[in-house]
Amino acid sequence: MTLEMMGSMDLDQIVADAQQSFEQAADITTLENEKARFLGKSGALTELLKGLGKLDPEARKTEGARINVVKQQVEAALTARRQALADALLNQRLTAEAIDVTLPGRGAGAGSLHPVMRTWERVEQIFGSIGFDVADGPEIETDWYNFTSLNSPENHPARSMQDTFYVEGKDADGRQLLLRTHTSPMQVRYARMNRPPIKVIAPGRTYRVDSDATHSPMFNQVEGLWIDENISFADLKGVYTDFLKKFFERDDILVRFRPSYFPFTEPSAEIDMMFEQGKNAGKWLEISGSGQVHPTVIRNMGLDPERYIGFAFGSGLERLTMLRYGVQDLRLFFENDLRFLRQFA
Protein backbone atom coordinates (compact mmCIF):
# COMPACT_ATOMS: atom_id res chain seq x y z
CA MET A 1 0.00 0.00 0.00
CA THR A 2 1.64 3.33 -1.08
CA LEU A 3 0.77 7.01 -0.93
CA GLU A 4 0.06 6.93 -4.66
CA MET A 5 -2.94 4.79 -3.77
CA MET A 6 -4.23 7.21 -1.15
CA GLY A 7 -6.41 9.01 -3.61
CA SER A 8 -8.67 5.98 -3.64
CA MET A 9 -8.02 5.10 -0.03
CA ASP A 10 -10.57 6.03 2.59
CA LEU A 11 -8.63 6.49 5.83
CA ASP A 12 -11.90 6.36 7.73
CA GLN A 13 -12.37 2.87 6.30
CA ILE A 14 -9.02 1.82 7.77
CA VAL A 15 -10.23 2.97 11.19
CA ALA A 16 -13.52 1.15 10.74
CA ASP A 17 -11.81 -2.04 9.58
CA ALA A 18 -9.39 -1.91 12.51
CA GLN A 19 -12.15 -1.30 15.05
CA GLN A 20 -14.18 -4.17 13.64
CA SER A 21 -11.18 -6.53 13.54
CA PHE A 22 -10.17 -5.67 17.10
CA GLU A 23 -13.71 -6.02 18.39
CA GLN A 24 -14.03 -9.48 16.84
CA ALA A 25 -10.75 -10.69 18.39
CA ALA A 26 -11.70 -13.25 21.02
CA ASP A 27 -8.31 -13.39 22.74
CA ILE A 28 -5.02 -11.51 23.08
CA THR A 29 -3.19 -13.66 20.51
CA THR A 30 -5.79 -12.94 17.84
CA LEU A 31 -5.78 -9.26 18.78
CA GLU A 32 -1.99 -9.01 18.38
CA ASN A 33 -2.24 -10.68 14.97
CA GLU A 34 -4.88 -8.16 13.91
CA LYS A 35 -2.72 -5.33 15.24
CA ALA A 36 0.07 -6.38 12.87
CA ARG A 37 -2.26 -5.87 9.86
CA PHE A 38 -2.52 -2.18 10.66
CA LEU A 39 0.43 -1.20 12.90
CA GLY A 40 3.05 -3.91 12.24
CA LYS A 41 6.25 -3.42 10.25
CA SER A 42 4.33 -4.16 7.06
CA GLY A 43 0.94 -2.91 8.28
CA ALA A 44 -1.34 -0.60 6.32
CA LEU A 45 -0.53 2.54 8.29
CA THR A 46 3.17 1.76 8.50
CA GLU A 47 3.39 1.43 4.73
CA LEU A 48 1.61 4.76 4.32
CA LEU A 49 4.04 6.46 6.69
CA LYS A 50 7.01 4.97 4.82
CA GLY A 51 5.73 6.48 1.62
CA LEU A 52 5.65 10.04 2.96
CA GLY A 53 9.26 10.55 1.89
CA LYS A 54 8.17 10.57 -1.74
CA LEU A 55 6.03 13.71 -1.28
CA ASP A 56 7.08 17.34 -1.31
CA PRO A 57 7.44 18.95 2.17
CA GLU A 58 4.01 20.62 2.25
CA ALA A 59 2.14 17.51 1.08
CA ARG A 60 4.20 15.36 3.44
CA LYS A 61 3.18 17.55 6.38
CA THR A 62 -0.51 17.43 5.44
CA GLU A 63 -0.66 13.71 4.68
CA GLY A 64 1.47 12.87 7.70
CA ALA A 65 -0.94 14.69 9.99
CA ARG A 66 -3.92 12.82 8.49
CA ILE A 67 -2.23 9.45 8.85
CA ASN A 68 -1.14 10.17 12.42
CA VAL A 69 -4.70 11.04 13.42
CA VAL A 70 -5.86 7.72 11.97
CA LYS A 71 -3.00 5.91 13.69
CA GLN A 72 -4.03 7.40 17.05
CA GLN A 73 -7.62 6.25 16.50
CA VAL A 74 -6.46 2.72 15.63
CA GLU A 75 -4.18 2.61 18.69
CA ALA A 76 -7.03 3.83 20.89
CA ALA A 77 -9.28 1.04 19.59
CA LEU A 78 -6.49 -1.48 20.18
CA THR A 79 -5.96 -0.27 23.76
CA ALA A 80 -9.67 -0.38 24.49
CA ARG A 81 -9.99 -3.95 23.22
CA ARG A 82 -6.92 -5.06 25.17
CA GLN A 83 -8.46 -3.66 28.33
CA ALA A 84 -11.79 -5.31 27.58
CA LEU A 85 -10.15 -8.70 27.09
CA ALA A 86 -8.09 -8.25 30.26
CA ASP A 87 -11.21 -7.31 32.23
CA ALA A 88 -13.09 -10.32 30.88
CA LEU A 89 -10.22 -12.64 31.80
CA LEU A 90 -10.01 -11.13 35.28
CA ASN A 91 -13.75 -11.51 35.84
CA GLN A 92 -13.56 -15.12 34.69
CA ARG A 93 -10.69 -15.76 37.10
CA LEU A 94 -12.44 -14.01 39.99
CA THR A 95 -15.53 -16.09 39.40
CA ALA A 96 -13.48 -19.29 39.38
CA GLU A 97 -11.61 -18.27 42.52
CA ALA A 98 -14.54 -16.92 44.50
CA ILE A 99 -13.80 -16.66 48.20
CA ASP A 100 -16.02 -18.08 50.90
CA VAL A 101 -15.98 -15.27 53.49
CA THR A 102 -17.25 -17.64 56.17
CA LEU A 103 -13.97 -19.59 56.17
CA PRO A 104 -11.42 -18.91 58.94
CA GLY A 105 -8.89 -16.17 58.25
CA ARG A 106 -5.33 -16.87 57.16
CA GLY A 107 -2.19 -15.71 58.87
CA ALA A 108 0.15 -13.20 57.24
CA GLY A 109 2.88 -14.81 55.16
CA ALA A 110 6.47 -13.64 54.99
CA GLY A 111 7.67 -12.18 51.72
CA SER A 112 10.75 -13.23 49.77
CA LEU A 113 13.04 -11.95 47.07
CA HIS A 114 11.88 -12.01 43.46
CA PRO A 115 13.83 -14.68 41.50
CA VAL A 116 15.42 -12.04 39.26
CA MET A 117 16.57 -10.09 42.32
CA ARG A 118 18.04 -13.31 43.70
CA THR A 119 20.07 -13.58 40.50
CA TRP A 120 21.02 -9.88 40.68
CA GLU A 121 22.39 -10.26 44.22
CA ARG A 122 24.12 -13.54 43.39
CA VAL A 123 25.90 -12.00 40.39
CA GLU A 124 27.07 -9.06 42.52
CA GLN A 125 28.34 -11.44 45.21
CA ILE A 126 30.27 -13.64 42.76
CA PHE A 127 31.99 -10.79 40.94
CA GLY A 128 32.56 -8.92 44.21
CA SER A 129 34.48 -11.94 45.48
CA ILE A 130 37.04 -11.52 42.66
CA GLY A 131 37.52 -7.79 43.04
CA PHE A 132 34.88 -6.21 40.80
CA ASP A 133 33.17 -2.99 41.92
CA VAL A 134 29.43 -2.49 41.40
CA ALA A 135 28.29 0.67 39.61
CA ASP A 136 24.90 2.16 38.83
CA GLY A 137 23.94 4.61 36.10
CA PRO A 138 20.96 6.57 34.76
CA GLU A 139 18.15 4.73 33.02
CA ILE A 140 17.32 7.88 31.03
CA GLU A 141 20.51 8.15 29.03
CA THR A 142 21.85 10.49 26.37
CA ASP A 143 22.14 9.45 22.77
CA TRP A 144 25.88 10.10 22.99
CA TYR A 145 26.57 7.73 25.88
CA ASN A 146 24.16 5.05 24.65
CA PHE A 147 25.34 4.98 21.04
CA THR A 148 28.03 7.43 19.92
CA SER A 149 30.52 6.81 22.74
CA LEU A 150 30.19 3.07 22.07
CA ASN A 151 31.33 3.36 18.44
CA SER A 152 27.83 3.72 16.98
CA PRO A 153 27.79 7.29 15.58
CA GLU A 154 24.73 8.82 13.99
CA ASN A 155 23.54 6.80 10.96
CA HIS A 156 25.82 3.89 11.93
CA PRO A 157 24.10 0.66 10.76
CA ALA A 158 24.53 -0.88 14.22
CA ARG A 159 21.84 1.46 15.55
CA SER A 160 19.23 -0.49 13.59
CA MET A 161 20.01 -3.58 15.68
CA GLN A 162 17.64 -2.41 18.43
CA ASP A 163 14.44 -0.39 18.58
CA THR A 164 14.73 2.42 21.09
CA PHE A 165 12.32 4.29 23.38
CA TYR A 166 13.18 7.97 22.84
CA VAL A 167 12.26 10.54 25.50
CA GLU A 168 10.94 14.04 24.90
CA GLY A 169 13.42 16.78 25.67
CA LYS A 170 17.19 17.03 25.64
CA ASP A 171 19.94 17.25 28.24
CA ALA A 172 21.79 20.44 29.23
CA ASP A 173 24.08 20.06 26.22
CA GLY A 174 21.18 19.64 23.80
CA ARG A 175 21.67 15.89 23.31
CA GLN A 176 18.75 13.55 22.60
CA LEU A 177 17.48 11.55 25.60
CA LEU A 178 16.31 7.94 25.55
CA LEU A 179 15.69 4.93 27.78
CA ARG A 180 19.01 3.10 27.70
CA THR A 181 18.97 0.00 25.50
CA HIS A 182 21.80 -1.68 27.43
CA THR A 183 23.97 -1.06 30.50
CA SER A 184 27.04 -0.57 28.28
CA PRO A 185 27.02 3.26 28.66
CA MET A 186 28.33 2.66 32.18
CA GLN A 187 31.61 1.52 30.60
CA VAL A 188 32.37 5.06 29.49
CA ARG A 189 30.77 6.81 32.47
CA TYR A 190 32.68 4.74 35.03
CA ALA A 191 36.01 4.91 33.19
CA ARG A 192 35.77 8.71 33.00
CA MET A 193 35.48 8.86 36.80
CA ASN A 194 38.01 6.16 37.70
CA ARG A 195 41.56 5.47 36.60
CA PRO A 196 42.81 2.02 35.51
CA PRO A 197 42.95 -0.70 36.55
CA ILE A 198 39.15 -0.79 36.20
CA LYS A 199 37.14 -3.85 37.27
CA VAL A 200 33.42 -3.18 37.47
CA ILE A 201 30.00 -4.68 36.83
CA ALA A 202 26.92 -2.54 36.22
CA PRO A 203 23.58 -4.32 36.71
CA GLY A 204 20.40 -2.44 35.90
CA ARG A 205 17.16 -2.09 33.98
CA THR A 206 17.26 -1.61 30.21
CA TYR A 207 14.56 -0.95 27.62
CA ARG A 208 13.86 -2.02 24.04
CA VAL A 209 10.74 -2.16 21.87
CA ASP A 210 10.22 -5.92 22.06
CA SER A 211 7.83 -8.32 23.76
CA ASP A 212 7.42 -12.10 23.45
CA ALA A 213 8.15 -15.28 25.40
CA THR A 214 11.89 -14.55 25.49
CA HIS A 215 11.95 -10.73 25.28
CA SER A 216 10.44 -7.95 27.37
CA PRO A 217 10.24 -4.16 26.77
CA MET A 218 12.05 -3.81 30.12
CA PHE A 219 14.68 -6.30 31.16
CA ASN A 220 17.61 -6.45 33.55
CA GLN A 221 21.17 -6.72 32.30
CA VAL A 222 24.60 -6.85 33.88
CA GLU A 223 27.56 -5.26 32.15
CA GLY A 224 31.11 -6.32 33.01
CA LEU A 225 34.29 -4.37 32.27
CA TRP A 226 37.98 -4.96 33.02
CA ILE A 227 40.49 -2.40 31.71
CA ASP A 228 44.24 -2.52 32.36
CA GLU A 229 47.51 -2.61 30.44
CA ASN A 230 47.69 -6.36 29.77
CA ILE A 231 44.16 -7.80 29.71
CA SER A 232 43.60 -10.48 27.07
CA PHE A 233 40.74 -12.51 25.66
CA ALA A 234 42.04 -15.38 27.78
CA ASP A 235 41.19 -13.32 30.88
CA LEU A 236 37.63 -12.90 29.59
CA LYS A 237 37.29 -16.65 29.04
CA GLY A 238 38.67 -17.46 32.46
CA VAL A 239 36.58 -14.92 34.37
CA TYR A 240 33.29 -15.72 32.66
CA THR A 241 33.72 -19.50 32.75
CA ASP A 242 34.50 -19.31 36.47
CA PHE A 243 31.44 -17.11 36.99
CA LEU A 244 29.13 -19.61 35.27
CA LYS A 245 30.41 -22.50 37.36
CA LYS A 246 29.88 -20.54 40.57
CA PHE A 247 26.48 -19.20 39.52
CA PHE A 248 25.06 -22.59 38.55
CA GLU A 249 26.97 -24.36 41.34
CA ARG A 250 28.30 -27.11 39.11
CA ASP A 251 31.52 -27.92 37.32
CA ASP A 252 30.06 -29.86 34.37
CA ILE A 253 29.71 -26.73 32.25
CA LEU A 254 31.33 -26.36 28.84
CA VAL A 255 31.77 -22.86 27.44
CA ARG A 256 32.37 -21.78 23.85
CA PHE A 257 32.95 -18.37 22.28
CA ARG A 258 31.39 -17.87 18.83
CA PRO A 259 32.65 -15.02 16.60
CA SER A 260 30.05 -12.27 16.44
CA TYR A 261 29.75 -8.52 15.91
CA PHE A 262 29.17 -5.69 18.37
CA PRO A 263 30.24 -2.13 17.50
CA PHE A 264 31.82 -1.57 20.92
CA THR A 265 34.08 -4.66 20.95
CA GLU A 266 36.65 -6.11 18.54
CA PRO A 267 36.99 -9.04 18.36
CA SER A 268 33.46 -9.87 19.53
CA ALA A 269 31.97 -13.17 20.61
CA GLU A 270 28.69 -14.71 21.69
CA ILE A 271 29.14 -16.90 24.75
CA ASP A 272 27.33 -20.25 24.79
CA MET A 273 27.33 -22.83 27.56
CA MET A 274 26.38 -26.48 27.78
CA PHE A 275 25.66 -28.73 30.75
CA GLU A 276 27.22 -32.19 30.53
CA GLN A 277 24.45 -33.69 32.68
CA GLY A 278 20.76 -33.09 33.40
CA LYS A 279 17.77 -32.29 31.21
CA ASN A 280 19.68 -29.69 29.15
CA ALA A 281 22.70 -31.94 28.63
CA GLY A 282 24.21 -31.65 25.15
CA LYS A 283 22.42 -28.37 24.28
CA TRP A 284 24.35 -25.19 23.62
CA LEU A 285 22.57 -22.28 25.32
CA GLU A 286 23.31 -18.65 24.40
CA ILE A 287 24.16 -16.77 27.57
CA SER A 288 26.02 -13.51 26.83
CA GLY A 289 27.70 -11.18 24.37
CA SER A 290 31.34 -10.20 24.90
CA GLY A 291 34.62 -9.08 23.40
CA GLN A 292 37.75 -6.95 23.67
CA VAL A 293 36.81 -3.28 24.16
CA HIS A 294 37.08 -1.38 20.87
CA PRO A 295 39.92 1.20 20.71
CA THR A 296 37.39 3.93 19.85
CA VAL A 297 35.47 3.19 23.05
CA ILE A 298 38.68 3.24 25.10
CA ARG A 299 39.51 6.61 23.52
CA ASN A 300 36.04 7.91 24.47
CA MET A 301 36.78 6.80 28.04
CA GLY A 302 39.63 9.32 28.02
CA LEU A 303 42.26 6.58 27.90
CA ASP A 304 45.06 5.78 25.45
CA PRO A 305 44.13 2.65 23.42
CA GLU A 306 47.84 2.15 22.70
CA ARG A 307 48.39 1.60 26.42
CA TYR A 308 45.15 0.21 27.78
CA ILE A 309 43.11 -2.78 26.69
CA GLY A 310 40.32 -4.78 28.27
CA PHE A 311 37.24 -6.90 27.86
CA ALA A 312 33.52 -6.37 28.33
CA PHE A 313 30.48 -8.60 28.48
CA GLY A 314 26.74 -8.14 28.82
CA SER A 315 24.36 -10.77 30.19
CA GLY A 316 20.59 -10.72 30.68
CA LEU A 317 19.65 -11.38 34.31
CA GLU A 318 16.29 -12.84 33.28
CA ARG A 319 18.11 -15.19 30.90
CA LEU A 320 20.38 -16.39 33.70
CA THR A 321 17.37 -16.82 35.98
CA MET A 322 15.43 -18.79 33.36
CA LEU A 323 18.33 -21.21 32.89
CA ARG A 324 18.96 -21.59 36.61
CA TYR A 325 15.34 -22.38 37.49
CA GLY A 326 14.06 -23.89 34.23
CA VAL A 327 11.54 -21.12 33.48
CA GLN A 328 10.31 -21.21 29.86
CA ASP A 329 8.49 -17.86 29.51
CA LEU A 330 10.23 -14.63 30.52
CA ARG A 331 6.91 -12.82 30.96
CA LEU A 332 6.15 -14.90 34.06
CA PHE A 333 8.67 -12.79 35.95
CA PHE A 334 6.55 -9.65 35.46
CA GLU A 335 3.00 -10.94 36.06
CA ASN A 336 3.24 -10.93 39.88
CA ASP A 337 1.44 -14.27 40.09
CA LEU A 338 2.09 -15.50 43.63
CA ARG A 339 1.51 -19.09 42.56
CA PHE A 340 4.59 -18.75 40.37
CA LEU A 341 6.69 -16.61 42.72
CA ARG A 342 6.15 -18.82 45.77
CA GLN A 343 8.15 -21.56 44.06
CA PHE A 344 11.28 -19.48 44.68
CA ALA A 345 10.54 -18.44 48.28
Swiss-Prot record:
Binds 2 magnesium ions per tetramer. Its EC number is 6.1.1.20. Pfam families: Phe_tRNA-synt_N, tRNA-synt_2d. It catalyses: tRNA(Phe) + L-phenylalanine + ATP = L-phenylalanyl-tRNA(Phe) + AMP + diphosphate + H(+). PANTHER family: PHENYLALANINE--TRNA LIGASE, MITOCHONDRIAL (PTHR11538:SF41), PHENYLALANYL-TRNA SYNTHETASE (PTHR11538). Its cofactor is Mg(2+). Its main location: cytoplasm. InterPro entries: aa-tRNA-synth_II (IPR006195), aa-tRNA-synth_II/BPL/LPL (IPR045864), Phe-tRNA-synth_IIc_asu (IPR004529), Phe-tRNA_ligase_II_N (IPR004188), Phe_tRNA_ligase_alpha1_bac (IPR022911), Phenylalanyl-tRNA_Synthase (IPR002319), tRNA-bd_arm (IPR010978). This is Phenylalanine--tRNA ligase alpha subunit. GO terms for biological process: phenylalanyl-tRNA aminoacylation. It comes from the Bacteria. One of its GO terms (molecular function) is phenylalanine-tRNA ligase activity. NCBIfam families: pheS (TIGR00468). Keywords: Aminoacyl-tRNA synthetase, ATP-binding, Cytoplasm, Ligase, Magnesium, Metal-binding, Nucleotide-binding, Protein biosynthesis. Tetramer of two alpha and two beta subunits. Mg(2+) binds at E266. The gene is pheS. Belongs to the class-II aminoacyl-tRNA synthetase family. Phe-tRNA synthetase alpha subunit type 1 subfamily. One of its GO terms (cellular component) is cytoplasm. It is found in: Cytoplasm.
